[in-house]
Each structure stands twice: as C-alpha cells, then as structure tokens.
Amino acid sequence: MNETIACTPESAVFEAPQLQFNEEGWGPCELPDAFKDIPYQPFSKSDRLGKISDWTGTAQTDKKYPNKYASQFGGGNQYAYYHEEDETTFHLVDSARIQKQPHQRGRFRGNLRNQRGRGRGGRGGVQAGGMTTLSKNATKGRDQRRGTTRKWGARPPPKIRDASVAVRPDWVTVEEMDFPRLSKLSLPNVEKGEDITTCGTLEYYDKTYDRVNVKNEKPLQRVDRIFHTVTTTDDPVIRLLSKSHGNVYATDAILATIMCCTRSNYSWDIVIEKIGDKLFMDKRDNTEFDLLTVNETAIEPPNEDGNSLNSPRNLAIEATFINHNFSQQVLKSGEKEPKYKFDQPNPFIGDDEDGEVASVAYRYRKWDLNNGIELVARCEHDAVLLTPQGDTQFLTIKALNEWDSKVANGVEWRQKLDTQRGAVLANELRNNSCKLAKWTVQALLAGSDQIKFGYVSRAHVRDSSRHVILGTQQFKPQEFANQINLSMDNAWGILRCIIDICMKQKDGKYLIMKDPNKPMIRLYDIPDNTFESDGEEEEGDDGEAFQTYAYGPSAATTAAATAAANAATAAAAVAAAAAAAAAAATTTPAATETVATATTEATTPTTATKTTAPAAAQK
C-alpha cells in the first residue's frame, strides 16, 4: 500500500547548525556579538554579591569557623557595583559597635584565607563576623603599652649558661645521652632497700610548728650546728662495706641527681671511678654540688649578675642557709629533751670535734638492680616523730623559700598560703621541679615515713638575712611522688643505664656532666690525676676558691676527724655486717685486693661546715 505524506508549511523543518572546529585548542573560535565588551569575572555560588545585596555582613551563624565556606573567587572585587553618582540618598547612620553574643568569643580565630591585602578601609572580601584584626604595628604598640615587649618577640632570649666544669682538651667523650631517650627508660620491680647498718642520733620534731600560719608567723633562727657533707670515697663506712657488700657505691644526693637528671636545667657533674668490677660515684671537692637551686625550672629563671642580691649563686646560698636552719629549728633541742639513737654513733664525729653537730642519722642500704649489680648508698634522716599510736616515724625536713614573688612571676605567699596552699605548692612545683623531685627521691631511698616542707619567706624583699616561717605541710613520699609525676621505675632505669655504660669501660676515672644549654648528659673519659690539686683548692672562673656553704666571709669551717679516728669509728659501725658477709663475698681476690689497696692509701677527709648568715647579713 503506497501512501504519500504531504508536508505542509505549518510542519517543523530541521536545519543543521553551523559547527565550528577549533584545530588549535578547544572552545569556540569566535566570540559571539552578544558577549562582546563584557568583562570576565570568576564566579562562585557561595560568593557575596557585593554591597548592593550584602545585608548579612555582621550576621554569622557559624561562630567557631566564620569563614569556613570562603572561596578563592572572592578575591576579585574590582567589578563590584558601587553607587557613587547619586548623592540624594546620602544620610548619617549609627556607627556604634554592635554588642556580640559571648558565645565562645575570642576562643577561636577565623579562617584567615583571602585576608591578605585587605587593609583598613578595604572594599569587599569575606568579613570575619565583625572581628577586628590588629595589624603588626598595632599589636606591637599594644605590647609596648602593656610592657611586654621583648627583644626576641613572644619568645624569651636563649639562656646561655656556664658549665659546672670546663671541658679540657684531653677529655674523651664516651657517650651522649639525651633526655628524651632517658625519659623512656624503665626498671620496674626494684625491691626496697635493705639496711646494712645505721648510725647517728635524731631529735624529735616539735609539733607546735604545724600550727604556724601567715597570721602567726615565726622568725627563722640561726642555728649554729655543723653539717657534714662527705662524698662517697671519703666515707669510712662505705670503704669497709666495699670489701663485702655491693659493687656500686654512692650517696643519696648523688643518686637523686642522676635519677632526676631529665628535670634539670643547670649544669652539674659527678666523678665515677672504676676499679675492677666496682664503681664509686663521687662529687668533686669544693664545688657547689650541695647548694640548692632556686627557680631552676621556671619560665624565666634568675639571671642577674653575680653581685646582685638575686643572682643564681646568692639565691642558692640563701636557700641552703634557710634549709639548714629550718631543719634544726623545728626540732626539740636541749640536753633534757629525749633523742633517738641508732645502733652506731655518727661516723664523722672525731674526738677533737668542736661545736654541736646537726641532728642527722645515716642509713646505709643496698639494692639489687639485677644482672649482678648491687648498689650500696648512704641515706639520711633529719628527725623522728612519735605518733599518737606510739609508732616511730622518720622524717625528711626541707624548706621552700620565697625571695621575690614579683620578679619570680610567682604567687604572693602571705595572701595565698592560708587560703590557697595548693596554688602555692603548684607554683613551686613548676618553678622548682628538679629540686622537689630530688628531695622526694632522697626520702624514698632513705625509707622516710613523711617528708615535711616548710614555707619560709624573707622578712623584707630586699633583705636576704632575715626570714620568717609562714607554714608547714607534710606528705608521704610515695604519694607526693605520684602527685609530681615522678616515676621511680624511670629513675631506676636511668641509673641502671649509666651503670651499665660505665661497667663496659676500662678501669679509670670518668665524669658525667649535664650540658649547660642542651637537654643531655655526657660521659667523659678523663685522666686519673684530674681534679687532684695536691691539697690546693681548685679555683672558680672568678679566681676565688669555691667554699661549700660559704655563707659569708666569716663562715667557720672546722676540720673533721683524723683518718685513724674515722676508720676506728667506721670499723665499730660495720664490724658485725662485715663479719657476717665475709664468707659470702662475691668479688674475686684480685679485685678485693685492688679495692683494699686503693682505699687504704687514700686519706679520709670530711667536710664539716657551720651554717652562718648570708653575706648580706654580715655587711
């Protein structure tokens, strides 16, 4: 069936369009007439349209990130429309600042993208919710008005400290141990120390000082007593114990310095002598090792010159002076007062000892650190306390001192101590973290039941000779260690790491020194005759001989017992322990003979000092 379809004029006719073929690229080859003379501007749907429709300039729904949806296309505003010809609609408006809601105000800063080049009075751009961004000059001027301008901007200048001892050219660096690596060490499950022998006499603590407060302060008295600061190899008891007990020997102060080295900022050094399979850790004679640091870990530690009242060395002397006097003032002293006596007398008191000796007891203990390492150390107690139940507790007494709260960026003790004692202690933990950690380690090593802190402040901020006691506070050593985040496992791990490194070395003399400006310690191999001055005192950088606890030009330094008297006293103290352990000695005959020869030929000097007032009080 054939049909014919007729096309009428009303039917749609398809006409093929003309297609342009661009051989050199893509897109049209010619610009249509409809789009000529029209400027091109990048466009984004999230862009603000300009001043005509910008009625949401101060409104902001997202307070946390006001410019979260800002786009890079908003950078081109040169084609925005501005009505400048018609002035008939000109009128004044209220330009008062709109009070914003306090929702997270000032907590977060907006996205600063696309803010470059938009200075004061700039047109368009993304508004940061009405927030004003200060320029660099404006911020600098504000800081100058507030008195917070520093040479180094927001950061304090680098602190250049001096080393505790000058490194000599003939010293060989054996090992460098940085603090981040040491802080990761751990030696768990170290048993408590076992007593070998105990010596000395203790006085009882006066509980009336627990009631001292800011309104009922007590002046700090000057107690004229002798404190013995004897190093390891000069201790006659340790010399005899080295023949039958242990293979590593030290004092509690030396051990605490090593265990808490990751918290220290100031430089210090310890001498180690390796004889056979034995290590002797010593402090150098006539150094400032026993002086207490002040604000060592503060953000801005004391950095005044040496002649200033608040120089680091003068503050250390003042803190040691306060600590010695406070630890003796809070005791019940007198001939009629009862005293707690240990099995053996003080091994450092000779027959020709002049003056009264401070209340102190020595506990010689040993620890098993595994792998054949047995540590023997001398620990100290400061006082004894009788509880209401009749139990006897041993105390470690220390003093915290306030010197100038404004300079030290601290808390005013006389205003906060009675009401906010926790804030005062927290500030001390921040400024003296290393010192408090070492005190805690010493109390734990000695097995003290309580550690008692005294808060001592200057009577006047510019007078370092007169002080007052504002209060006391006591803690259990283990609980206080947990509060200050002190891990004994890490402390034992650091000590064991250093012992292992030294045990691998050949026999000789070594020195561990904290780098004065870097968080690391170094082990040096030094000649055997280093620091041996043949009776002459080693001079410091200023040409003056160091004097431990030299509080003033008239500080009295008394000679200690002779070598024979000390050896006889020590022999009586450890006779029973040495006889019992003679058969169980683990050292070889050759090593024992070497140690015996080395300890017999050496002398046994002891350092005994009287506490007197600081130099400022005697001028």
From Swiss-Prot:
Determine the domain of life of the protein's source.
Answer: Eukaryota
For this record, an example GO cellular component is: eukaryotic 43S preinitiation complex
Give the UniProt subcellular location, in the record's own words. Cytoplasm
List, in alphabetical order, the GO biological process terms annotated in this UniProt record: cap-dependent translational initiation; formation of cytoplasmic translation initiation complex
From the UniProt entry, list the residue stretches annotated as the region Disordered. Answer: 99-160, 588-619
Does the entry feature the keyword Cytoplasm, yes or no?
yes
Region spans: RNA gate: 288-302
Where does the UniProt entry say this protein principally localizes?
Answer: cytoplasm
A Pfam match = eIF-3_zeta
Which keywords are on file for this protein? Cytoplasm, Initiation factor, Protein biosynthesis, RNA-binding
- Which molecular-function annotations from GO does this UniProt entry contain? mRNA cap binding; translation initiation factor activity
Q: Which InterPro entries match?
A: eIF3d
Provide ranges: composition bias, Basic residues: 100-121
* Family affiliation: Belongs to the eIF-3 subunit D family.
Q: Per its database record, what is this protein's job? A: mRNA cap-binding component of the eukaryotic translation initiation factor 3 (eIF-3) complex, which is involved in protein synthesis of a specialized repertoire of mRNAs and, together with other initiation factors, stimulates binding of mRNA and methionyl-tRNAi to the 40S ribosome. The eIF-3 complex specifically targets and initiates translation of a subset of mRNAs involved in cell proliferation. In the eIF-3 complex, eif3d specifically recognizes and binds the 7-methylguanosine cap of a subset of mRNAs.
Give the quaternary structure: Component of the eukaryotic translation initiation factor 3 (eIF-3) complex.
Q: What's noted about domains in the record?
A: The RNA gate region regulates mRNA cap recognition to prevent promiscuous mRNA-binding before assembly of eif3d into the full eukaryotic translation initiation factor 3 (eIF-3) complex.
Instruction: List the protein's name.
Output: Eukaryotic translation initiation factor 3 subunit D
State the species of origin: Aedes aegypti (Yellowfever mosquito)
